């Protein structure tokens, strides 16, 4: 099989359009979007009194710190943060406030428009002029409407961070120029050493190189551009360089290509136009390796041929010349193919190795037949060889183009699969976010249920305490009622003889109050039964809480409990009002009873006094009688009566005719 080299430099790439014309004839939707974003940010700045455009450089700084930590390590990221911080402090301390805000806002908006795909064009320049005019004419003077102390560090960062990035860019540019200079120096040294090596070659090979030069000059009748492009792009050396490059130069170039390949692989996803760059670098590396192998084989063949010539002393001078000529002629196409970047087939390699190493007469005859003297090499033969090489190179170009098309199809398929994977990743992320939101909502609902249950437990404890307090009050009221009933019974028994109809109303009132008290006790029993039922329901709810099988059942039970507790609170408030009314009625009845008892006691005292006075008077003057008009007590009968004897505490005898003092 014949190995072919791909012509990497002639890969078809899309032509770069001029950015200015593309910006002029581009769509206006992008610039309308810029204007809308700018207007919205200015409106937010005016409403919230904060400059939100200063947050964009801060976000860029965070991204650059993350990238530096990811690709260059912790030390470089810390160094970068320190440098940016010192730059921000310098800008904060040494730049005036108005100029600081003006420069920061202007830089942010100009940089925002600069980062578009259009580049420098008429709409972007007009937008820059508009932004600078608004910042200089309106916002440069009105700093009172903003939080200056809060916005000032961000404004300093908007100026300090670009200064740091420009410094790093300048440093990379200087290092790149120094590297190019070093490469040129190494290239000059390699060329010098190559010239020394060429001068150290035998004169016969120098004559062969001169003949090759003449053949190349004769081939200039063909199209110069095609031959030069083919020779140059196939990895060969131009005509002024006689042989291939040395090993150190090839290794240096391979290292540089590997570095470029790593950098291109790192930036592969930035632009779709740069997708084929790693493929080009790989093909170029293969070309350099093939050139290196060809140069090695060429040198080995030359050394082997010279050794064979020195060993064969028995041959004549003509045979030596023929052998040298055959070695040179056989090596010249090889060197030519090496300069063109192609590698000979395995069969040709084996034949040449056998010709250089074998000493058999058959091999010697083949060499003598294939060799041609130097003076017999004519220019038309060189032209024929060049045409054959051109045909081979065209075939190689077609093969490389086919390989390029296959690679592009693979890249397109890989890009489509990557897009599908990205869309799937986006869907999976959305599903993950939805699941996380559902979990968060479920956790929140669980916490709310726990809080509601704890609140209900607190309310139940408060209700139980209120219930115990009410029961204590009821017991005290019952005791008070019993004491009041006992005192009332005593008062009624004491005043039953003297008072007939005045206490009937009070007795009826007491009976009514007793009936109301019985009703209240019945109501209290009913309420106690309800409270017991509620306690049972609370126990059931606690069981539901321990199980936590269904939150909806808990919520419905909690709502029912809330309604019932509200109803109980309302009923308890009504009961307390009724009790207060009953207590007020009892107090009024007690007052009336006390007043009536006081009146009865006063009347009894008056009756006793009158009885004593009457007994004394009747004892002193028994013959005196009173008429009906003067007697307020008994108008028909006399003042003396047997009724007074029963109740009189006096020791006088009312039946005595004459007053006699008592004998001791």
Curated annotation (Swiss-Prot):
GO terms for molecular function: microtubule binding. It is a multi-pass membrane protein. The keyword Phosphoprotein applies. One of its GO terms (biological process) is neuronal signal transduction. The chain crosses the membrane at residues 28-48, 75-95, 120-140, 154-174. The modification Phosphoserine is found at residues 305, 332, 631, 634. Residues 320-348 have a biased composition (Polar residues). Pfam families: Macoilin (PF09726). GO terms for cellular component: axon; neuron projection terminus; nuclear membrane; rough endoplasmic reticulum membrane; synapse. Residues 253-265 have a biased composition (Basic and acidic residues). Its main location: endoplasmic reticulum. Keywords: Endoplasmic reticulum, Glycoprotein, Membrane, Nucleus, Phosphoprotein, Transmembrane, Transmembrane helix. Residues 253-274, 320-367, 630-664 are annotated as: Disordered. Plays a role in the regulation of neuronal activity. Belongs to the macoilin family. This is Macoilin. It comes from Sus scrofa (Pig). The gene is MACO1.
